[in-house]
């Protein structure tokens, strides 16, 4: 079960990049919004899925696929929005914010889980974050 999430993440990144370029004609916000919406749906399903249910592994794979998939579209936004001359700086700024919020978010998520004693709450938190991103991402413009 532990491998399902990262395997899904790896394939999601490839699929998201390809869909962004080929199907959505480099409209990054569409693939980001779609994948994050589907990630929210998968995370909600994981939250309600009973422990050791046979759908746990495939659902976790899909959760990783749709949660991490938008990463490739995020990084492609840097040259799209900032041009080649500033793409490296833009990527660095995006990485900085990603790691700062990850660093701040992990203790908060850990506290919520520890306070409630329910590890599945991580999926509810991920679902809320993904749904928020899905709603906001269509406003990204080139």
Where are these regions (language model features)?
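Intracellular juxtamembrane helix-capping segments at the cytosolic ends
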Residues: 68-82
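Cytoplasmic membrane-interface "Motif A"-like loop-to-helix N-cap segments
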Residues: 22-36
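A membrane-interface helix-boundary motif in multi-pass transporters
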Residues: 27, 109-129
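Hydrophobic core of transmembrane alpha-helices in multi-pass small-molecule transporters
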Residues: 53-69
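Helix-to-loop junctions at the C-terminal end of transmembrane segments
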Residues: 13-26, 113-114
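C-terminal ends and interior cores of transmembrane alpha-helices
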Residues: 37-51
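A late C-terminal transmembrane helix in Major Facilitator Superfamily
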Residues: 79-118
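Multi-pass alpha-helical transporter architecture, strongest
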Residues: 46-47, 124-142
């Amino acid at each position: 079960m532990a491998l399902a999430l990262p395997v899904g993440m790896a394939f999601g990144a490839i699929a998201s990049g390809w869909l962004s370029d080929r199907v959505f004609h480099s409209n990054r916000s569409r693939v980001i919004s779609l994948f994050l919406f589907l990630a929210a749906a998968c995370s909600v399903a994981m939250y309600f899925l009973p422990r050791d249910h046979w759908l746990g592994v495939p659902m976790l794979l899909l959760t990783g696929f749709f949660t991490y998939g938008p990463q490739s579209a995020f990084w492609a936004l840097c040259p799209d929005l900032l041009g080649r001359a500033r793409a490296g700086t833009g990527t660095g700024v995006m990485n900085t914010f990603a790691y700062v919020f990850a660093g701040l978010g992990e203790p908060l998520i850990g506290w919520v889980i520890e306070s409630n004693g329910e590890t599945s709450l991580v999926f509810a938190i991920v679902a809320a974050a993904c749904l928020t991103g899905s709603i906001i991402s269509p406003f990204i413009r080139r």
